[in-house]
Every structure is written in C-alpha cells, then in structure tokens.
Design a protein with these regions (language model features):
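Short, glycine-/aromatic-enriched active-site segment of Class I SAM-dependent methyltransferases
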Residues: 14, 137-162
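Short beta-strand-to-coil "C-cap" segments at the C-terminal boundary of structured domains/repeats
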Residues: 230-232
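Helix-to-beta-strand junctions that scaffold the AdoMet/dcAdoMet cofactor pocket
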Residues: 117-118, 131
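Conserved helix-to-beta-strand junction in the class I
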Residues: 126-130, 137
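Short catalytic micro-motifs in class I SAM-dependent methyltransferases
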Residues: 109-116
Length: 232
C-alpha cells in the first residue's frame, strides 16, 4: 500500500526535513493568487499538510481570527506539526476524507499531494463538497527533458512516492473532469528555490531564460515547474 511509505517512517528517513524548505516558496505563490481573487478565508484546511510549515507561514498573512487546520496520515509528520500548533492553528493525525465532523471550510489546500494518492480521482471527488474554494499544487513532471532522462520518474517514485505524473493540460483536465470549476491557474517555477542538486542548479539558467520567453513551451521542454490551480 502506498500509505505505508508515509506511516512507517520510511518517508521521513528519505526526506528528514519533510520539504519544509519549500514552504516559503509555496507561500510566495499562494498569496498572490488569494490577493488576485480578493479571497480572505476565515477557515482554512490543508489536506496532507506534512510538517505544517505552510500553514504556519500562511497564518501570519491572514486575519488574526482565522482558524487553520492541517490533516496528515503520517505519525512522523504529525509530531513535527505539534511544535507549530497554536490557539488557532490545529493539526490532526487522520485521513481527512474519513472525518465526518469537520466544518465547511472557506479554503481547502492540497499541495503536492495528488501525485502520491493511488486513486486520486476518488480523492478529489471526496474533497469537492468540503470547502468553497480549493487550491491544488501539482508538479508537472512530464517534459521532453524528463522523458529523455528516463530515470527521473522512477527516482521520484522511489524517493517521494510519486505514483502519477502530469502535464499542465492533464492536471487541469483531471480537476475539471471531476466537476470542479477552474477559476485560475499559474505556473510555479522551481528554479526560484535553492537546491543542493547540481543537475537542478545546472538547469536553472536555461529554464529561467526560456520561461521568460514562452512559459508553456519552457515547461513542456525543460520541466522543473508546478501548477497552482484555484477551483470551486
């Protein structure tokens, strides 16, 4: 079962920081999307919140009365969340889909989660009625460069548990096919983040230059990007 990767402690061994270093970058893309659509959520939930760092950072940009909840199935991630909890930031070790007593949230965030879920169609279908707005962050791993390298898909499967791979078009279509209305989307280029991987750093300049010229073409050919989708 895919869930064992996250509940057994194996994922923490492979990723001891649980991607907290990516959280400021994610916030830098989430906030402009909320501002653009004049969204000021008073209740926020993140499904698959990991260490809870995104919620902790987001809380500092929202109204002081905003209530935030984070759910994750990993006991190890939940332990990391505990040190970030406060009066209005709560975390729960649970599968959000099986929770029946949750409120209807203003905003539900699913950030870098869909690619990990065995049946992401049922997963997305179960979330649709749980909030007014949704934010999905999905890695776009299918690119010419990725296909030519070949091994990247298996490497991401082994280390990160990525079971599914997307292009911009398949990510948007997957959301739409399940009855969501896509209100907006934006690319989130990974070259903005620091990296200790030399191959990633080598690709930063060409990705940045190509992205400035033609975003769609750059992502299709060179990859290294995610898509942030706002939906209802």
């Amino acid at each position: 079962m895919a869930e064992e990767l996250y509940t057994s402690g194996q994922y923490l061994e492979e990723n001891p920081a649980w991607h907290t270093y990516e959280s400021p970058w994610k916030i830098a893309h989430i906030l402009p999307m909320l501002k653009k659509h004049k969204l000021e959520p008073r209740t926020v939930c993140e499904v698959g919140c990991g260490a809870g760092e995104v919620l902790r950072l987001l809380q500092g940009h929202l109204d002081a009365d905003t209530t935030l909840w984070g759910y994750d199935i990993s006991p190890q991630a939940f332990e990391m969340c505990k040190e970030r909890a406060n009066e209005r930031l709560h975390f729960k070790l649970a599968d959000f889909r099986r929770e029946q007593d949750t409120p209807f949230f203003d905003l539900l965030m699913v950030l870098d989660v869909i690619e990990h879920v065995e049946d992401y169609f049922s997963f997305l279908r179960d979330l649709k009625s749980r909030s007014q707005y949704k934010l999905f962050l999905i890695p776009l791993e299918i690119s010419v460069q990725g296909v030519l390298r070949g091994k990247i898909f298996i490497q991401n499967r082994n280390r990160y548990g990525h079971l599914h791979h997307f292009t911009k078009e398949t990510a948007l279509r997957s959301v739409e096919d399940l009855g969501y209305t896509v209100l907006d989307y934006a690319y989130a280029p990974e070259y903005e983040m620091e990296s200790k991987v030399w191959q990633t750093n080598l690709m930063k300049l060409p990705r940045r230059i190509c992205f400035a010229c033609n975003q769609d073409l750059a992502v299709r050919i060179l990859g290294g990007c995610r898509i942030l989708i706002l939906a209802q």
